[in-house]
Amino acid sequence: MTSAVETKTEDRDLVLTRFIAAAPNKVYRAWSEPELLKQWFAPLPFTTPVAELDLRPGGVSRIVMRGPDGTDMPNAGVYLEVVPNRRLVFTDAFRGPGWEPSEKPFMTVVLTFESEGEGTRYTARVRHGTVADRETHEHMGFHQGWAICANQLAALAEGLA
């Protein structure tokens, strides 16, 4: 399990990339099956009690992370692109069916799952509308939090049959 974090490929992007010793379909399953996503999505000791995924362009995603103190952090969004086993793109710019705009869009996430040797080159590119939003996300702990989650994702995907 090796990780590399690339901070700014563009002035508004944050990027995490790593090799996962599991086939792309297994890494994709961990992102696309609610019961699997709940097992790794939040950095421990946080949990993910809710994962509702309508995995199609225009489909709604509703994920809730719960902190150790019981505080819920809802994450709502819409899928923009779904290419099974290869690519997922979603955004929080919309929060429900009918393309209802969010009050404060923050990011669009582009996930790629590329076959590499005996595993997957996993890349999460998180695009922000402004440099200030990217900086806010960085200061919130993007690198540490997303790296922890990528480790949890890898452990789960590598154990899938």
Regions found by a protein language model. Name each.
Residues 1-47:
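Hydrophobic ligand-binding cavity/cleft-lining segments
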Residues 15, 26-28, 62, 87-89, ...:
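General beta-strand recognition
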Residues 31, 41, 92, 150, ...:
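Short, flexible helix/strand-to-coil boundary loops that buttress conserved ligand/catalytic motifs
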Residues 38, 42-43, 49-57, 62, ...:
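Hydrophobic-ligand binding "helix-grip"
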Residues 50, 156-161:
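Short, highly charged C-terminal tails/helix-capping segments
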Residues 98-144:
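Beta-strand/loop substructures that line and gate deep hydrophobic ligand-binding cavities in soluble
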